[in-house]
Amino acid sequence: MGVRRFLNLFYDWEQHKLGDIGTLKNGMNFSKEAMGHGYAFVNLQNIFGNNVIDNHNLEFAEASEKQLIDYSLQKGDVLFVRSSVKLEGVGEAALIPENLENTTYSGFLIRFRDEYGLNNNFKKFIFAIRQVRNQIMSQATNSANKNISQSVLENLTFNIPIKEEQRVIGQYFSELDNLITLHQRKQL
C-alpha cells in the first residue's frame, strides 16, 4: 500500500529512468562570430539558480532554419547544465514554461523532452531534490570543468506519482516558491 500524502492519495510512486520517459539532446555550439546577433538562445547563466527559464534575458546567436527546428524549445522541455566549473552547478535544471519560437540552447546544456506527460510544475522541482541531485553529481566527470553526459541523464532514476498527485505537489511547491520570492522582495 502507498504512503499517505497530499489529498489523501495512497498510490505507489513508479520508478522510471529519465531516458525511458523522454528524449535528450545536447545543445548547439556557437562560434565567436555567430554571437551577439541573430536568434535568442538559452545559456548556462539563464539556468543557474532558476528552475524556470525567463525568456527576457537571453543572448543572441546565428542559427540556420534547420538548427531552429533541431534545437527548438517547447513548453515543458527541461534544460540541464551539462558543464559547470563547480560540481553543484552540473545537472541544474530549468523548465521551459512556454514555447520559445526561434530560440535555441547552448552546447553546455542538454534538453529533455518529456514523452510521459509529467506535470510542468512537478518538473520544476523534481530535478532539484537531493536524491536526484546526488545521482547526477556522483556521475560527473572531472576535467577543467565538471561534466555530465546524456547517458548519465538517461540512466537517472526517480519516482513519479500519479498525474493528480504531480499536479498537487507541483502547485504546492510553486506556491511556496512564490511566497519565498514575495518575502525576499519585502526585505529589499
What does each model-found stretch correspond to?
Residues 1-14, 162-188:
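Amphipathic alpha-helical segments with low aromatic content
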Residues 7-28:
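Non-catalytic DNA-recognition/assembly elements of restriction-modification systems
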Residues 33-52:
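Short beta-strand/loop turn elements enriched in aromatics
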Residues 43-44, 49, 58-128:
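A short beta-sheet element
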Residues 50-54, 146-148:
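Short acidic/His/Gly/Ser-rich catalytic and metal-binding motifs that mark active-site loops
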Residues 102-108, 141-167:
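A short glycine-rich beta-alpha junction/loop motif
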